[in-house]
């Protein structure tokens, strides 16, 4: 059996029903480690709801989200969702990367919610918190059920991912697009292979994601690209952005969204610890940029806008397609609205 060697444990030890009160609150069934996913523990839970209503939705292109996972093995050091793991009594650093909560019944619960007479078939965004095509999806395959439920109910959907596992579902996504409006977006903001390995260690390579863009287009779907977050002094040079947007255009993307890094909550400390270790010469500059809060100052955003706008025009990446941005206030503070 494929999972015959799996162990039900947390940190290599049998589960103690009282050891993880945060998980118990959200319906823990069991915790599993498998040799195919070395270093990752999956915490299987039974969720009571699937649809999440977004606060302040008037400022976003969607009002509802579905997230089948909490935590993410992509391990992006800048991930804004890291603080959400603290509610589960995990830390927002390595625990966020290795302790992944799986809502095993999410598709069934979603189908029930979509049958309610009160459901108005508003757009549902997938991938706004943690990546729906992270490694866990290879084991649990939650997305086919989620996509199928939304399409069958007549509900428009959007998908945002760094995960090349989306290729598996391209026939299903293309079929769904015949029934309801569907938008697909790939996140790709780091073109340098060495920096990618350091700052997004669990994600597919930039080249693999470029190939994913091409595959999405070959399936007859538009593909937007989220060039975000742009990292000050690391990925914001004209040379890097020119090369990256050129590659994205060559891959067949229909448009891009560009905005800079924001650092809030415990994500700020996690990222700054990495920066001090990997690029100590940049620490003072980042402290200055973020001294007033989690967002880059207007002067920086204007600089980035002026740098990016000509490149978007050069590579004809100003498509009208609008993907669902991350479920965060950063979506309310873009580089420039015209880049969306």
UniProtKB/Swiss-Prot annotation:
Binds 1 [4Fe-4S] cluster. The cluster is coordinated with 3 cysteines and an exchangeable S-adenosyl-L-methionine. The keyword Transmembrane applies. One of its GO terms (molecular function) is 4 iron, 4 sulfur cluster binding. CDD domains: Radical_SAM (cd01335). It is a multi-pass membrane protein. [4Fe-4S] cluster binds at residues 72, 76, 79. One of its GO terms (cellular component) is plasma membrane. Its cofactor is [4Fe-4S] cluster. Pfam families: Radical_SAM (PF04055). InterPro entries: Elp3/MiaA/NifB-like_rSAM, MJ0683-like, rSAM. Keywords: 4Fe-4S, Cell membrane, Iron, Iron-sulfur, Membrane, Metal-binding, S-adenosyl-L-methionine, Transmembrane, Transmembrane helix. The chain crosses the membrane at residues 140-160, 243-263. Its main location: membrane. It is found in: Cell membrane. This is Uncharacterized protein Mb2609c. The lineage of its organism: Bacteria, Bacillati, Actinomycetota, Actinomycetes, Mycobacteriales.
């Amino acid at each position: 059996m494929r999972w015959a060697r799996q162990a039900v444990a947390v940190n290599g030890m049998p589960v103690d029903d009282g050891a993880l009160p945060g998980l118990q609150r959200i319906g823990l069934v069991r915790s599993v480690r498998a040799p195919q996913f070395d270093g990752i523990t999956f915490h299987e839970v039974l969720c009571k709801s699937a649809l999440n209503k977004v606060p302040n939705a008037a400022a976003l292109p969607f009002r509802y989200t579905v997230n089948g996972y909490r935590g993410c093995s992509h391990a992006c050091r800048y991930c804004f969702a890291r603080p959400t793991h603290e509610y589960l009594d995990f830390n927002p650093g390595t625990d966020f990367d290795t302790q992944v909560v799986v809502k095993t019944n999410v598709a069934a619960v979603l189908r029930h919610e979509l049958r309610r007479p009160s459901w108005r078939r508003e757009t549902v965004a997938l991938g706004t918190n943690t990546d729906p095509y992270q490694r866990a999806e290879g084991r649990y395959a939650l997305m086919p059920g989620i996509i199928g439920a939304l399409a069958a109910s007549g509900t428009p959907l959007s998908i945002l991912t760094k995960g090349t596992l989306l290729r598996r579902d391209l026939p299903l996504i293309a079929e769904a697009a015949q029934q309801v409006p569907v938008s697909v977006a790939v996140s790709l903001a780091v073109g340098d292979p060495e920096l990618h390995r350091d700052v997004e260690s669990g994600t597919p390579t930039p080249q693999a994601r470029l190939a994913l863009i091409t595959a999405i287009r070959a399936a007859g779907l538009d593909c937007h690209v989220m060039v975000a977050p742009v990292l000050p002094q690391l990925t914001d040079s004209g040379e890097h952005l020119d090369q990256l947007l050129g590659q994205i255009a060559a891959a067949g993307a229909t448009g891009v969204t560009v905005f800079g890094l924001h650092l809030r909550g415990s994500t700020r400390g996690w990222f700054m610890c990495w920066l001090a270790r990997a690029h100590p010469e940049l620490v003072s500059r980042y402290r200055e940029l973020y001294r007033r809060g989690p967002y880059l100052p207007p002067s920086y955003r204007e600089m980035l806008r002026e740098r990016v706008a000509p490149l978007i025009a050069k590579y004809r990446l100003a498509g009208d397609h609008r993907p669902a941005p991350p479920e965060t206030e950063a979506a309310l503070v873009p580089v420039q609205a015209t880049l969306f």
